[in-house]
Structures are given as C-alpha cells and as structure tokens.
C-alpha cells in the first residue's frame, strides 16, 4: 500500500490526461515479454505502468519498472552501397505533400499515430503471409527511438518490408502505401483484409509536417531480397539506393525541423503513443520499454472478460475511482461492424456532468487505433453520461482520420447504439427493479432530456420506456413505467393520465386528483421539475395520449349530473344561490378571471382554477418569467374559477357577500389565490400575507 501511495503521489498529476490517453500494461500476444530495465527517467503516467499479470495495477507497474533489461531492435548498421537513383514524385503526390504539410492534420502529433498504423499493417501482412505458408512467426514488433541530441525520431517494424520497386511505387505515388494493393489481392479473404488500417495511402506523408528530411530503410521478407534506403526532403524529389545492414522490415528516420524538436523527447512521444496507439495489436516499444501492454478488451468475446477486468478498464477510460454501475459489452456485425463497451458510473452525476457543455465521454477507435477521444456524433447528447469505447471498421473517415464525415452511415451507427443502450436499460429494469430505480433517480434528467431534444416520435417513445413514476394505483415509493401503466388500462381506454406535483402528499390532496378519483382512473404522479415538459413533448405513448388531469377537467364533456350527489339539500347551495354567488364573484375578482363556474367534482376543496393546457402555460410562465401582475397572468392564462357549492367556505361566502361585504372580498380574494397556488400558477405567495393577517384579525374580533 505504501508503494502504491508513493506512485500516486509521484505520478498522480498525470491522471489529468484525456480519457483513453494513458498507457497501460499487458502481455504480448505474438512474442515473449521482455521486461524493461529499471529507469529513473522522466515521470511516467500511472496508467502507462499497468501490467497484464495484474491488470491496471499500480503495484504491478512498479514491479515492472524495477525488472529486466531494455529491449530494442533499432541499430545504426545500415550503410548505402553504390550510387542512388533519383525519382520525382507524381504530380498528385507533390500536391498531397503540400496539403499534408499545411492543412490536412489539425495536430502535428498525429504523424506518430499514422506511422505506427502503417507499421501495424506491415506486421499484419507478414503474419498473414507466414500463416498461409505454414511458417513459424518471428518476433513481430514495433519500435520507436528518440534522440534529442540529433533531433530525430525513429520508428522500425519487423514486418513484411519492401523491395526497391515497392519503395518507388508505394512511397512515390499517392494512395499506394501498400495496403490498397494488398486488399485488392485479398478481396476474397475478409479476415485478413479487415485488419488493414491504412486505407488512404497518405499516412506516411504526415511525417513531412515535422521533418526536414525522411530516411526509410527497408528489406522485403521475400527470400534473397536486398536492403534499400529511400530518402527525401519532401521537395518533390526522392532517391533510392541499395544499403547493407538492413533488417527485414521497415525503419523510418525522421530528421525533425527546428520547430518540431519536441518529438525528439521521450516524454512527449510517450504521451502521443499512449493517447492514440495504446491498443495496437503488436508489441510496441519506446526506447526499449514496452508501451502497449493493455488489452483492447472491447475486441474480446464478452464471456472472456471478467468483472474485475471491466472494473479496472472502466477506471481507465472514465478516469474515475468508483465502480461501474452498469456494464454493456456489445458486439455485432450487422447492420454494422461494432465492437464496444459502455459503462454507467456508480457515482451520482455532478452539476458539471449534467451540463450539455461536457460533451461525449465515449472514445472512437478504428481497428484499435484512436480516432477521437470525445466522439460527439457516435451517441446522442442525452447519453453523455455513458463512458466507454466504440470500435467500428465501417466508419467513414476523412483523410486525416480525425474528423467524422456527416453521413447516413454515422447516423445509422448512432441509431443502432442508442437503441441497444435503451434495450439494455430496459432489460436491467426488469432484472433488478430496485437497482434501476436508483439509476433513474440519479440519471433520470438525462432520459428526460432525450425525450425533449429528440425529433422523431418513434425514438421519443423508445426513450420513454425508461421513465419511471409513482402511481395512484400503487403504494408510495413503488415505481411504474408507461408500458406497465398501459398494460393495466381497461379495454377501450385511450388516455394515460398524469399529475405533476412536488410530492405524493400534495398530489393526493390536489383538487385535480380529487376530481379524478370519482372516475376510479389511475394517475401517474410526477415529482420532478422537468417531468411536465417531458410529457408535453412526448404527447403520446403506444398510441395512447398523455393527458394531464388538469387538462382533462377542461376538455371532458361529460355532464355534472353524472356524479351522484348524495349530500342533503341543506349541505349545498341552491341553484339560485349558486348563480347569484357566481355573478358576485365575477364582479369581485374582475379581470383576474375569465369566468366562474360550479363543479361537483370536488369534495374537500372549495375551488380550483382550470386553464386550457395548464402544463404548457405553467412552463411558459416559468421559463419566460412573464405576466408578473395578476392581471397580466389572467390575460395570458384566461383562467376559470370552479367553485364547490357544498364546501363550507363557499356557503359562508354566499352569506357574507350581503352581511359583511368587506370580509367577503377578503375571503374571495384568498380563495382565488389559494386556487392559483394549488395550480402552480403563482410562485411567490408572500404578497397574500397581509390579507391573511386581516382575515385572522377579523376571526379574532368575534371572540
């Protein structure tokens, strides 16, 4: 523990690097592991020390750092033999070199990624060739070496290599880095072709962004092949000469420009390698130290990845210290090739996490080569709380591999992943309802956002399957989904009813719910601020309209006589008394109301306000902060006050309007504002305090 703490103190500052931008440890796939020697060089990121024997472990990292000699195949034995022949780049290639040097790549550092990808291609070609011929595989490795004194960076692979003719054609002609021709030859062998990264033939030329000149030494794996040197300063001419001491494979020496000498620094190159090429299939060494020892577990069969591996990989990609609440390891080849892992953090999201400015937390790879650390087009914005990795061979990229093209394919990929995540969360809710309820409590705001911001109704309804609410038909604390509500509906019922209130107590004692109880209709109780806006945007679910009980009271056309009034005649105002009282109230309230009506839907409440589309009006007032005065609100809302002629306050008001008109005015004003507050149409009740005090004084004067 002390050693781990020491490592954290020493290298903890490195944890601020971007997601998926730190290296890890692991075991080579195709060659024996050569442990690196002890080194007291530049600080290493904690993630870059992870070891496959104890995955992602800082202790394993320290053990690795203390063991064994360095391993490198890079030497300086090459020597040019005889004279060189000069060649001119094709016209298209000259133009490409200029584009690459000036504007193709947004970051110079990506030349390292491109050259590593090319080296991986060369090794994959060699592997395929030897396996098809039944030969044993040699050590298949990629090595990088930095030399700050000479201002160079070297990359060497032990791959298939190139002949003289291949050097001229592959490095002197656009779109012929070798991969395209190789794929043509293997067009009927999908397994081999699918692993070739370099599709565009321009990655090699990215070296000229930082190079004064580039030397390439290469020797083909074919028997009897000689070694050659290719040399160019990118000015439009290159030369090729025979060379001795060349090892099978390809070695590229980049002589850096004065303004690019940073790439002769081991620390700088390490950061770039761990950012982009941490999961290359072949062992990758920098100055003799193994770099890419972390497995790309998203490429593995899900059943072969243990819970512990997922926990450690989650901490790596999310740069977090908790455990994943949910894990989805998703692989498919239809309709698109997708290899992905998604995690939901166990920690409750902070306000920063909720912000739409945060953006995506999913990294995009193509055949284990990083394309984007925050792939904004791969998942819709509402799923930004999901951490993980997506790897797809079908994604169209521009020449620099850095920006996704807007295309139907990208939208299709986003749709596939969104649907799969929705299905996953739906399945989890059935598997463990209590765990899902905790998830929805923490992440429900994102789900609501998804419904509000999605245009397609079908997708809205898919996302709506994740919503959870309490219900009048279920005990307090028990949640239900819209699908479950629909399954309990009686035949012929077409509406799903809901009521927005701060809590269950207020919902159950709402005059609007009281009016619905007589109909014995299930009502969903929605407690969160944005529930109302969410359901207004959703509009319907499974061909059933979503109706607020407040709206239902306004649009329902059944007659009051449908309610059986069992109250004795003396307990209710007569029809004439009611008509006279309503006329007086219209005059007393003036422009604050549009009309006064009678209702027999209420039992315990004296009155309620009805407004067409109450929820939309309430949201409009809240968001726009309009209509601050009562008259302005009334003009916008056109509210109707519905009174209960059986309530003691209404009956007493009928008496006071003649005997004590001043007290009656105070009382009707208070009844009106109480109804407005209950409807959520008045946010600040403080202005009524003076009137309440007057009513209290009037009450005490009688004692």
UniProtKB/Swiss-Prot annotation:
What positions are modified (Phosphothreonine)? 173, 493
Residue numbers bearing the Phosphoserine modification: 169
Its primary localisation, in coarse terms, equals mitochondrion
Keyword Nucleotide-binding present in the record's keywords: the answer is: yes
Q: Where, per UniProt, does this protein localize?
A: Mitochondrion; Mitochondrion inner membrane; Mitochondrion matrix
Binding-site list for ATP: 118, 157, 170, 204, 401
InterPro entries this protein is in?
HATPase_C_sf, HSP90_C, Hsp90_fam, Hsp90_N, Ribosomal_Su5_D2-typ_SF
For this UniProt record, the keywords arranged alphabetically read as follows: Acetylation, ATP-binding, Chaperone, Membrane, Mitochondrion, Mitochondrion inner membrane, Nucleotide-binding, Phosphoprotein, Transit peptide
- One CC-aspect GO term: mitochondrial matrix
**Residue interval of the organelle targeting sequence:** 1-56
GO biological process terms held by the UniProt record: negative regulation of cellular respiration; protein folding
Read off the SMART domains from this record.
HATPase_c
Q: Which residues carry this modification: N6-acetyllysine?
A: 423, 430, 465
Named from the GO MF annotations, one term is: ATP hydrolysis activity
Its biological function? Answer: Chaperone that expresses an ATPase activity. Involved in maintaining mitochondrial function and polarization, downstream of PINK1 and mitochondrial complex I. Is a negative regulator of mitochondrial respiration able to modulate the balance between oxidative phosphorylation and aerobic glycolysis. The impact of TRAP1 on mitochondrial respiration is probably mediated by modulation of mitochondrial SRC and inhibition of SDHA.
Subunit: Binds to the intracellular domain of tumor necrosis factor type 1 receptor. Binds to RB1. Interacts with SRC. Interacts with SDHA.
Q: Which family does it belong to?
A: Belongs to the heat shock protein 90 family.
Q: NCBIfam families of this UniProt entry?
A: PRK05218.1
Q: Write down what this protein is called.
A: Heat shock protein 75 kDa, mitochondrial
| Native source species | Bos taurus
